[in-house]
């Protein structure tokens, strides 16, 4: 039996490795790999924005060790931040249905 959180972790890891190493280090996302991942896997996050300056700023913010690539740890920090933003967004809505047990 697969549990939802285990499945989520599997998807998180496998998605990273699906895009990493297409052009270089197989354990890191370069600029174009990250952009492809975001466009294909998180299109709602980018929305209609294809602003190159905004993407460059995101890349710069994610690349904490300044090697011009995003490693798995940096990727996880990014996903954690996105998850926290989603949680904060939904905290503003009143509960209309009882919580599942």
Swiss-Prot record:
Binding site for Ca(2+) 1: 28, 33
Function noted in UniProt: Calcium-binding protein that plays a role in various cellular processes including motility, angiogenesis, cell differentiation, apoptosis, and autophagy. Increases cell motility and invasiveness by interacting with non-muscle myosin heavy chain (NMMHC) IIA/MYH9. Mechanistically, promotes filament depolymerization and increases the amount of soluble myosin-IIA, resulting in the formation of stable protrusions facilitating chemotaxis. Also modulates the pro-apoptotic function of TP53 by binding to its C-terminal transactivation domain within the nucleus and reducing its protein levels.
Modified-residue entries (N6-acetyllysine), positions: 7, 35
Biological process according to GO: positive regulation of canonical NF-kappaB signal transduction
UniProt keyword terms in alphabetical order: Acetylation, Calcium, Cytoplasm, Metal-binding, Nucleus, Repeat, Secreted
Residues covered by the EF-hand domain: 12-47, 50-85
Assembly, per entry: Homodimer. Interacts with PPFIBP1 in a calcium-dependent mode. Interacts with PGLYRP1; this complex acts as a chemoattractant that promotes lymphocyte movement. Interacts with MYH9; this interaction increases cell motility. Interacts with Annexin 2/ANXA2. Interacts with TP53; this interaction promotes TP53 degradation. Interacts with CCR5 and CXCR3. Interacts with FCGR3A; this interaction inhibits PKC-dependent phosphorylation of FCGR3A.
Entry's Gene Ontology cellular component terms: extracellular space; nucleus; perinuclear region of cytoplasm
InterPro entries assigned to the protein according to its UniProt record, in alphabetical order: EF-hand-dom_pair, EF_Hand_1_Ca_BS, EF_hand_dom, S-100_dom, S100/CaBP7/8-like_CS, S100_Ca-bd_sub
Molecular function terms, GO-annotated: calcium ion binding; calcium-dependent protein binding; RAGE receptor binding; transition metal ion binding
Species this chain originates from: Canis lupus familiaris (Dog)
SMART domains: S_100
Keyword Metal-binding listed: yes
Lineage: Eukaryota, Metazoa, Chordata, Craniata, Vertebrata
Binding-site list for Ca(2+) 2: 63, 65, 67, 69, 74
Signal sequence bounds: none
Keyword Phosphoprotein: no
Subcellular location field: Secreted; Nucleus; Cytoplasm
UniProt protein name: Protein S100-A4
PANTHER family recorded: PROTEIN S100-A4 (PTHR11639:SF51), S100 CALCIUM-BINDING PROTEIN (PTHR11639)
């Amino acid at each position: 039996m697969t549990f939802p959180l285990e499945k989520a972790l599997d998807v998180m890891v496998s998605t990273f490795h699906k895009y990493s190493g297409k052009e270089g280090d197989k354990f890191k996302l370069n600029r174009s790999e990250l952009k492809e991942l975001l466009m294909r896997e998180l299109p709602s996050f980018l929305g209609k924005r294809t602003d190159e300056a905004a993407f460059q700023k995101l890349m710069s913010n994610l690349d904490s060790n300044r090697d011009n690539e995003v490693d798995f740890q940096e990727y996880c920090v990014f996903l954690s931040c996105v998850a926290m933003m989603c949680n904060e967004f939904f905290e503003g809505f009143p509960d209309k249905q009882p919580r599942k047990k």
